[in-house]
């Protein structure tokens, strides 16, 4: 029998441990059970069989709260306050769907799994607590949370309705409130009438609140309409004024004060259709056009208000289009790449740039009339001037500010391809020499790095192989130096090489040409050195005659440059050493290697590492590191002054004291801003602009407010 009891206790303990959400230890449960049995000996809790339940069953139903109440001396049917007062209704708890999940979709979606997994334990709990009555807290005379005792649901309805009315701002007469005080003394029929009236009043108040919420925006709109009506009245007076005191710009400015975009569009288009009459003479485009200037200002004003990104034109844009485009179309249909037409086209595009962009015609004109002519002219250009064609160097750079990036890249690629083909197919006896102006144009257009890369890869090796190696030998000129021949008629030899070298000077980098001249005169100096070393005294003067003849022939048609003069002086220095009977090799470089020198020069100075430059990222406003941004507030102020035409300069040894910083005492240098005869002194500190007023005090202002 004892064994069976012990087994029963073990089974009961196992169930208790499985459903005990607080996981209390066995010792706590046993101690609490002993104390609770003593406390609940005389309480009113009874089971269905009439016996007092054990404390373990009580804790299974109410958890730790029952333990705490028993420890505090709780007796069933009485409160815990003085004289048995206290709360009469226990706080009802709600179990969560999952013991380890919080709020949200996860706990809801998994609650069924939790219930299914613990179904056995929950059913066991129901079996344990089945038949136990709820704990009842009998309230005495103490009020709950300070409220009066309410007998039925009607009293609660009255109290709640009065509270809602008070929160809604409805003040009931004092006489009605006195009739309801105390509420227990009011007869039930009267209570029913009061409830009905109060609820009806509350419904009316809610309806009024809804109406107020709907009418509040309408009141704002009504005020706006009154303001628009006043503006329309003023606008009518302005538009009816046919005198010249009110300009078209002022009239459109008055229209833009309205808030209705559709009305603005209609009025503006109607006004422009009536008053915009623009004429221009293609033969006198340089003359100022006041109407065009006013139209440009009007478009700048309209661009802030109208959406010009849409592919469909509004009424205002359509009106301007009908006035402007037909007149411009006549010119563009007859456009060709002659000098006069090119100048007129650039002038028209610059003058009408904002107008054409506003009406969406700029890209159409460029793609339909301008771009095809430009690209065709580039295809026909052979890198030299022709009678029937205008060189691209005259018009390409001017058009660069007007064309888009895609066409810019196309033009650059075409010029680069032509120069590459020229260098690749170059031959010294057949190929023409590109003029210096065209070489400068090509460098500027495709950039010097790409220019020298093509030159050193394609042109320079051919130049060295065909001219330097085969014709650069002054010793051949010793045989007939006395004969007066025209060297320009010869197609070989040293003079032919010098003629070609000097004609292609502008092709090379200055350092490259300097190396070539050094190598050329180094060969001449070797001959002079041997002449002075092995010849007789009588023949020494002949070497000077030979050098004079050589220089006079080479530089017959053009004076030598500074680089060439430097090498000429080194050669004549040999004669000075000969007169002193001391001849050294200071003017000679026996180890000189032109190809190696040019190769070193290309790697270090002339040609940068193109692959390294291509690896550098392209920075934009979005990805540029802050470490590479060096702009300061002083730079911003200087840029602003530059745009306004002001001159800003620092005043030497002049400082002022500003009420700025923690101690309100900051010493900063002074700057002077001038605009003609007007000037003012300013100070800069921590992105704040301080301007001196008439009293000599410096006060902070916004940069846009700086005006002279």
UniProtKB/Swiss-Prot annotation:
Residues 61-108 form the G-patch domain. Disulfide bonds: none annotated. One of its GO terms (cellular component) is cytoplasm. It is found in: Cytoplasm; Nucleus. Keywords: Cytoplasm, mRNA processing, mRNA splicing, Nucleus, Spliceosome. GO terms for molecular function: nucleic acid binding. GO terms for biological process: generation of catalytic spliceosome for first transesterification step; negative regulation of double-strand break repair via nonhomologous end joining; spliceosomal complex disassembly. Involved in pre-mRNA splicing and spliceosome disassembly. Promotes release of excised lariat intron from the spliceosome by acting as a receptor for PRP43. This targeting of PRP43 leads to disassembly of the spliceosome with the separation of the U2, U5, U6 snRNPs and the NTC complex. Component of the NTR complex (NTC-related complex), composed of NTR1, NTR2 and PRP43. Interacts with CLF1 and NTR2. Interacts with PRP43 and PRP45. Present with 556 molecules/cell in log phase SD medium. This is Pre-mRNA-splicing factor SPP382. The lineage of its organism: Eukaryota, Fungi, Dikarya, Ascomycota, Saccharomycotina.
